[in-house]
Amino acid sequence: MRVVGVEQDQREFAEFYAAAWDDCLRIVMVGVGDRALAEDLVAEAFTRAWASWRKVGGFAEPRAWVIRCALNAHVSWWRRHRREVALGSHDTTAATSQDPGLDTSLVAALRRLPVRQRQVIALRLLLDLDTATTAEMLGMSGSTVTTHLHRACVALRRDIPARNDQERVQ
């Protein structure tokens, strides 16, 4: 009888994986700016999700759990590798320019935002989570989420039209 439960878990997880992979990858890419690293982090997060699928599958937003797990893995990765990374060692714009559905000027503008603002933008606008869920995922209050979202939108409005004006002049 346990086999039936395992098969159902496998089927549910496979459906979740197929439906959530692209969203998770794009949101993590916004956070880390490197497609290869984002793919590794998302793969690790999905591996952890499968290992705890009975728990994770019961969450209201399992995608949010996977994204949070991937972003936490990025923090851990950065702590291990920060001494090895040379400033300016690679161009992240090239990594994102080949991705369909991503506007490179928007990705560049998002990368200039502080990390918390990027995370709020990714969760609230790209993943369409509500303020309370975003706040819980990021470990902050709902009003802090709203403040970060407002500041990020102001910065993006200021940055993106300026880039568009420069392109028209050239």
List the predicted regions and their residue ranges.
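Short, small-hydrophobic-rich alpha-helical interface motif
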Residues: 24, 28, 38-49, 69, ...
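A short pre-motif secondary-structure segment
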Residues: 120-124
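Internal acidic/polar
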Residues: 76, 83-110, 130, 165-169
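C-terminal flanking helix
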Residues: 21, 25, 46, 114, ...
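C-terminal edge and immediately downstream basic/flexible tail or linker adjoining helix-turn-helix-like DNA-binding
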Residues: 1-7, 12, 137, 153-170
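A short, charge-rich alpha-helical start-of-domain segment used by transcription regulators
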Residues: 2-25, 36-42
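Helix-turn-helix DNA-binding module
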Residues: 111, 115, 127-147, 154-158
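Arg/Lys-rich amphipathic alpha helix in sigma70-family domain 2
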Residues: 51-58, 67-89, 98-99, 162
